[in-house]
């Protein structure tokens, strides 16, 4: 009898801490402000390095997206060093949320958002 091959150990999927979930609009506003911080001429190299569609990122930055782009925003936040996971909650909601890993990440996000709101 052959020995059964097993893959790497996979952690069970636990129930998410919903207090760490950001609404789509908050994540979008954060990303727009962070993109506006990139110096003139720096956005194209950023997009090329992270394999983002330049025109779509420009539209996101300027608030001209035709529809919500949660997967793009998820990738963009990760490229801006905001670790997150997409979360569909409530389950029948048309918008997704962005789950931060811990309270420290949430506090950092809130602090940076407060800075953006004060600057605008």
Stretch-by-stretch model annotation:
Residues 51-67:
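Recognition helix of helix-turn-helix/homeodomain-like DNA-binding domains
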């Amino acid at each position: 009898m052959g020995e059964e091959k097993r893959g790497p150990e996979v952690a069970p999927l636990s129930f998410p801490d919903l207090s760490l979930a950001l609404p789509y609009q908050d994540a979008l506003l954060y990303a727009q402000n962070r993109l506006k911080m990139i110096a003139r001429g720096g956005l194209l190299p950023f997009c090329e390095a992270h394999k983002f569609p330049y025109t779509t990122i420009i539209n996101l930055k300027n608030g001209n997206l035709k529809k919500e782009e949660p997967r793009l925003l998820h990738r963009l936040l990760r490229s801006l060093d905001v670790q997150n996971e997409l979360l569909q909650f409530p389950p029948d909601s048309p918008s997704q949320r962005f789950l931060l890993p811990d309270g420290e990440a949430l506090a950092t996000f809130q602090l940076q958002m407060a800075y953006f709101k004060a600057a605008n």
